[in-house]
A protein has these predicted regions:
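Extracellular/luminal Protease-associated
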Residues: 78-120
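N-terminal low-complexity or amphipathic/hydrophobic leaders
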Residues: 6-74
Length: 122
């Protein structure tokens, strides 16, 4: 959380997502959210942090074998290792659950690294 002051993070925790989206919209940022994302569990604290983004595209089964995941430069692996402490990993899977945006091993790795949370639509 080097870029955003802790005081700013605390202030944002008190503001609704709808209010923030409206403010961004008024500033000309019209595509600043992923649609239909819901919390896994209601009643948990608001997740606030800088966004570290990753976008998946549909994979070709004939080209995207398990071997690609062994590559240390695979974008999913890079994102898990580079997402900064305190940040939120935001994954755009284009609403395709087959994209397998993150499993328990990757989520655990992010937790150990101090990432504040994950938002995904896939």
């Amino acid at each position: 959380m080097d870029h955003t002051a802790a005081s700013t993070i605390e202030k944002l925790k008190k503001v609704s997502t709808a209010t923030i989206a409206t403010c961004l919209f008024k500033k000309g940022l019209k595509k600043q959210f992923i649609q239909d994302v819901k919390p896994l569990k209601l009643g948990k604290p608001t997740m606030v942090g800088e966004a570290y983004t990753l976008r998946y595209i549909p994979a070709r089964e004939d080209l995207n074998t398990i071997e690609v995941f062994k590559n240390p430069k695979h974008l999913q692996r890079v994102a898990v290792e580079e997402c900064p402490k305190g940040a939120i990993l935001v994954i755009d899977s284009r609403k395709d659950a087959r994209a397998a945006s993150a499993g328990s091993i990757l989520v655990t790795r992010l937790m150990v690294r101090g990432v504040s949370g994950i938002v995904t639509d896939g």
